[in-house]
Amino acid sequence: MATDSSSRSASRSQFRDWDAIFLPDLTPTPTTVAFKGMLPKPDAIVPVPTVASAVLSTITLPWRVGQRLFRLRRAHETPRNPTFSLFVRPGEMVLVASAEPAECTQFLRAIVRHVSYPGVAVFCSAEDVHPHVLTVEQLLRFRLRARAVRSPGAEDDAVELLLRLFRIESIRNTLIGNAVVRGISGGERRRLSVAEALLSGANVLCFDDLTRGLDAATALHCVQCLRSVVDAYRLTIFASLSAASDTIYATFDQLVAIRDGHQVFGGPPTAIRPLRDDPQTQPAPPLASYFDHLHARIVPRASSRTAHDMADAFQRSAHYADTAVCLATYLAEEQASPRSSNQSPRHHQKRHATYRKVVALLQRQMLLAWKDRFALTVSWILFLVLGCTIGLACFQLQRTGAGAQARGGLLYTCVLGIAVSAQVEVAKTTLGRPLLRKVFAYRFERPATFWTAQIAVDTMLESMRVFIFAICVYFLTALHRTAPAFLYFLAVLLLLYMCNVLMNRAIGCMCRTFDSAIRTATFVFVFYMITAGYILSQATQPSWLKWTYYLNPLALAFSALM
């Protein structure tokens, strides 16, 4: 069901004024997707957690760490035949269907993961993850600025066209929201995710459950928009659907059917039409669409053929033979004219310099912090209350030798208060990883530029919080009231806070789950608290433990203040 030249020229004329607006300087290069004998493997096995498993995971933590370090444990994999073979030309849309949605997700992730150049293929998951404090227009503008150099007029036109294309003009100034903050609906969020994926400029787009949360009319409009963009820019799109009408079904050029980890069909969708009266398939309901008959084909009766039999039958079919011929021809052409491995298909595109990306990310991070004014105000109030509490508890300490021990306890309490307030970064980093993973995969941001901008914004915001805390503590407790001493006290606390923030973020990035991140951060904090020099002085520590003093920010800050 290939698209003819007349429809392509019509789509191109429809989008001719988008060439410099919709994807300026990021026109995707037509890419052929070909794979033979591909075997998708599961990422991991996630058992159902129980109370007993939580206790055992805590006790057996050293053994599990040793297993990961020395690779003693082998993953349990279901034996599967590497029967996945497909040849997709530029400008084609592929429908991925399976009785189990997880099989479609695994197949799409395998396509995106095995590419030579990052950003050439992107995966849009079924879960729509966006910054909840931004509006729809703000998100699109930041995504446009992150990809390439644009003039202000072109940026405005691109935003208007995107909003009009996906029919989300009415929510341009509405917060995206999340489970707590009220925002846009699920269908509007899904259309925003599709628009964001198009802005990535990737050559191959993989959509998991493309029409999730959309009604029939909106789903048809969304698929037709993607069809027009594919015809205009010769993209390659893989999409899985939970339900599809006959019009949506006819929009796709190829079909991949999966059952129990085997490819049971690969070819044009029109080949499924004669299967309505197949006695070996589960009968579809009356007036069912072709997509329903497809599911009836891959969900057979208990007495019908197995997945192995269906895969073997597909390998003996004419569609598999045509795919094998196309793959052999394509591989022969690739071997005849190999491209240099260092030549990226995006070397000609005009990109932002690193400092411009940092500036753009600085603006966005400042806007994110300012939008979340409630959390910002609460954190300032907590620092004020904490500083006043410590200051009033140690009000007007004696400046003689009698107050030396109390003064040491005061400084140690200040160090602990600053360190405890930075523990919240573990939860923020762990829960925010899906969004970061998405923007890094789309190449909207680079990790180095993102963390540089994040540290700069944190320094500006956290300096005000630490300043409020330092004023309350320093002047209520009658410490040495000179400008150099106060500035030194403030600088040590600020450096301590930033060190703990970065340490907790590193723990959140290294741990796989939220539970393991919290336990690791708590263990590290308690260890640093005990060996900081107040509870257990450095002189009384065993020789094998003294070297941790140089890795302990609490110990370094406490010794600097003393």
Task: Walk through the language-model features, giving the residues of each.
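Helix N-cap at the start of a conserved alpha-helix in ABC-type nucleotide-binding domains
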Residues: 209, 216-217
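Walker B catalytic motif
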Residues: 180, 207-211
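Conserved catalytic loops of ABC-family nucleotide-binding domains
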Residues: 201, 217, 221, 225-244
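A short, proline-enriched helix->beta-strand linker immediately N-terminal to the Walker B motif
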Residues: 197-204
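Conserved catalytic motifs of ABC-family nucleotide-binding domains
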Residues: 102-103, 128-138, 150
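Membrane-spanning alpha-helical segments of multipass transporters and channels
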Residues: 264-266, 274, 278-286, 296, ...
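Hydrophobic anchor residue at the start of the ABC signature
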Residues: 194-195, 222
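Topological signature of polytopic alpha-helical transporters
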Residues: 1-92, 97-99, 117, 124-126, ...
